[in-house]
Amino acid sequence: MDVDASIEQVTGILVREGLRYQMSADGRTHRLLFGSAAVFIDFNEWQDDSVVITVHSPVLQDIDSASAGAAQALNMLNDLNRSFFFVKFTYREGILIARYDLLGETLQAGELVNALFEIAGAADRLDDELAEVLGGKPYEVKAEEWSGD
């Protein structure tokens, strides 16, 4: 299965499940909004003929890399990863990310929907709570900044 076929399959699942999404200008990324969180779906080639579908959400952005909050984010990764069965958390360049990887060639609708709700639930639950501890901004705050509202 190639990336284009995976994008088409995921789009079909989202439509059939009644999940509202927006597509990036290049047609390669889906964005879904859940509460104060945004969940993105990206597609990457893997090995010779496979596709990895990554469902991810920026839980917090703009964490000052030189701050105590950044150090604390790194220190919490293990606890966060142990607290959620399927979600993995990473910290990179001031962004705390929740992600879930799926294999495209065996993707089933239930798997994708579960991944979306697991990531959305984790991000929406943690964004406000961790913003106070780590600094940084939830997606909803960043989106308002970008739009100038």
Identify what each model region corresponds to.
Residues 56-99, 148:
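Short, internal acidic amphipathic alpha-helical interface segments
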Residues 90-120:
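A short, solvent-exposed beta-edge/loop patch
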Residues 74-81, 108-134:
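Ampiphathic alpha-helical segments that act as solvent-exposed interaction surfaces
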Residues 131-149:
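Short, highly charged C-terminal tails/helix-capping segments
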Residues 1-13, 61-75, 140:
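Short, basic/low-complexity N-terminal boundary segments at the transition from targeting/disordered tails
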Residues 1-40, 91:
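Charge-rich, low-complexity N-terminal segments
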Residues 40-64:
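A short acidic-to-branched-hydrophobic micro-motif
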Residues 28-30, 51, 96:
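Hydrophobic residues embedded in beta-strands of well-ordered beta-sheets
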